[in-house]
Amino acid sequence: MGQKINPLGLRLGTNQDHYSIWFSQPKAYSKSLQEDQKIRSFIRNYIKNMKISPSGVEGLARISIYKRIELIEVRIFLGFPKLLLENRPEGLEELQITLQKELNCGNRRLNILITKVEKPYSNPNILAEFIAGQLKNRVSVRQAMKKAIELAEEADTKGIQVQVAGRLNGQDIARVQWIREGRVPRQTIRATFDYCSYPVRTIYGILGIKIWIFVGEDK
């Protein structure tokens, strides 16, 4: 069996940055790691509960965390920030206050920034959310994948591979289906990728969605 590595982890330190940037003493490391997990889970649940988009695509690309001695800076990368801010203008301030209480920051300030993703459908997390919404609405797997690839091509991606695994279309035996368009050099270390692995719960069980998007290549 082939051993499959996470393409983002493989490229850390070459052309991929960490999503959390901070330093900690060895004894306090696990506590800081749990704090990061709590921040990400809280923000994801907050955006999910707001139900900002009728299509079911929340548009959350990623959450980056930067920590200093007196400051925690959280950057939320959203594909559709207008929906969040128009739906609830005071939402960002409310999120900041609630999260600060949840974390028990003490003397540290919490600062939340929202950054817009210029081409939302060039991000694998947003595309995976779109496919998950289609599968929940009983659209066939092949059709959902093809539509996602069309959206990615409109966003000028250089290459994309979409894979869905599980009981596809309610079949008794679990299968894997994938489609690739353009160039996807997964073995090349200098090739920059965006990647996500996204589970979706359907009436037939849990399906796994994986998306690789080829961004470019370092010279």
From Swiss-Prot:
**Which GO terms of the molecular function aspect are on file?**
rRNA binding; structural constituent of ribosome
KH type-2 domain location: 39-118
Disulfide connectivity? Answer: none
Q: Where is it mostly found?
A: plastid
Cite the entry's keywords alphabetically.
Plastid, Ribonucleoprotein, Ribosomal protein, RNA-binding, rRNA-binding
Q: Which SUPFAM superfamilies match?
A: Prokaryotic type KH domain (KH-domain type II), Ribosomal protein S3 C-terminal domain
The reply on keyword RNA-binding is yes
Pfam families from the UniProt entry: Ribosomal_S3_C
Q: Where does it sit, as one GO cellular component term?
A: plastid
Superkingdom of origin: Eukaryota
The family database entries (InterPro entries) matched by this protein are listed as: KH_dom-like_a/b, KH_sf_prok-type, Ribosomal_S3_C_sf, Ribosomal_uS3_bac-typ, Ribosomal_uS3_C
- What stretches pass through the bilayer? none
Localization annotation: Plastid
| Keyword Ribosomal protein part of the UniProt annotation | yes
GO BP, one annotated term: translation
SUBUNIT field? Part of the 30S ribosomal subunit.
The family note in this entry says: Belongs to the universal ribosomal protein uS3 family.
NCBIfam families named among the record's database cross-references: rpsC_bact (TIGR01009)
Identify this protein by name: Small ribosomal subunit protein uS3c
Record organism: Cuscuta gronovii
